[in-house]
């Protein structure tokens, strides 16, 4: 069960409920968040056959200005709340856009799980890579998370390698991939990547997407697992797991690999 939004915005992203400056940790916003979290936990954590874990807060943005010390204090409060309500529930802690190893020694052995999100389209270097580069980068990331002293779940990832999906960067915000965003260089044309089905992509692009997905499965299962983002969307090639499965681009069963041992 994720906690996507906090008063004031914990990351400045539109999916926090408010796009713009980060104001979480100002005034009484942390207290409000703890109170809201407690109400959520009291409502759902008794349903242990449904909710096995709960996240303290989605994507607090430390590089963007969230205080790391303040976030650690908030995490301590949240773990205490969960232990009071249902001590058998695991608590997911976002890495705050730091490396998972940066959290070594914090709450280790206290039934907490590090949650890291891995996207390539928001990074100017990663978005420029070809499929071989994406596979190598993914496998390198899989090796990196093994350095954590706690369980690590890659709680968000996708099959897309560009930011071409409509409104991905925000409503009516242009793309990095086509060189329209913040003076980025142009890496290519979006074409059919903006909306629709993965079936509309070329055979080569579908093959590359399958290869990228399989590399991520190998990398993330080398630690403690993953959650794909997302199960169903309104026409976003690479992001829609139902669509990927229906078109043979996501392995089914998961052991059905066309590109085995890419991270060996």
Could you say what each language-model-derived stretch is?
Residues 191-264:
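Aromatic-rich peripheral "rim/lid" segments of glycoside hydrolase catalytic domains that contact
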Residues 7-17, 29-32, 50, 100-101, ...:
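Eukaryotic short linear interaction motifs
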Residues 46, 52, 59-214:
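Extracellular glycoside hydrolase catalytic/binding regions
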Residues 1-6, 15-53, 81:
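An active-site-proximal structural segment forming one wall of the substrate-binding cleft
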Residues 6-25, 168-179, 244:
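Aromatic- and acidic-residue-enriched segments that line the glycan-binding/catalytic groove
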Residues 3, 54, 93-97, 224-235:
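Acidic carboxylate-rich catalytic motifs and surrounding loops in phosphoryl-/glycosyl-chemistry enzymes
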């Amino acid at each position: 069960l994720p906690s996507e939004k906090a008063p004031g915005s914990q990351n400045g992203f539109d999916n926090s409920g408010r796009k713009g400056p980060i104001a979480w940790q100002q005034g009484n916003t942390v207290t409000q968040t703890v109170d809201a979290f407690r109400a959520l936990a009291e409502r759902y954590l008794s349903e242990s056959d449904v909710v096995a874990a709960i996240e303290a807060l989605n994507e607090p943005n430390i590089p963007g200005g969230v205080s790391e010390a303040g976030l650690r204090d908030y995490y301590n409060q949240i773990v205490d709340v969960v232990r009071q309500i249902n001590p058998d529930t695991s608590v997911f802690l976002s890495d705050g856009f730091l490396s998972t190893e940066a959290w070594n020694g914090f709450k280790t052995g206290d039934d907490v799980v590090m949650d890291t999100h891995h996207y390539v389209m928001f990074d100017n270097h990663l978005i420029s890579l070809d499929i071989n580069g994406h596979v190598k980068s993914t496998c390198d990331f899989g090796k990196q998370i093994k350095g954590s002293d706690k369980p690590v779940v890659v709680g968000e990832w996708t099959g897309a390698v560009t930011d071409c999906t409509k409104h991905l960067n925000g409503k009516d915000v242009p793309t990095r991939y086509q060189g329209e965003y913040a003076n980025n260089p142009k890496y290519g044309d979006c074409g059919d990547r903006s909306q629709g089905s993965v079936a509309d992509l070329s055979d080569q692009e579908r093959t590359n997407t399958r290869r990228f997905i399989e590399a991520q499965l190998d990398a993330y299962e080398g630690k403690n697992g993953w959650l794909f983002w997302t199960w169903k969307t309104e026409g976003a090639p690479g992001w829609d797991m139902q669509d990927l499965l229906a078109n043979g681009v996501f392995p089914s069963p998961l052991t059905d690999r066309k590109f085995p041992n890419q991270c060996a």
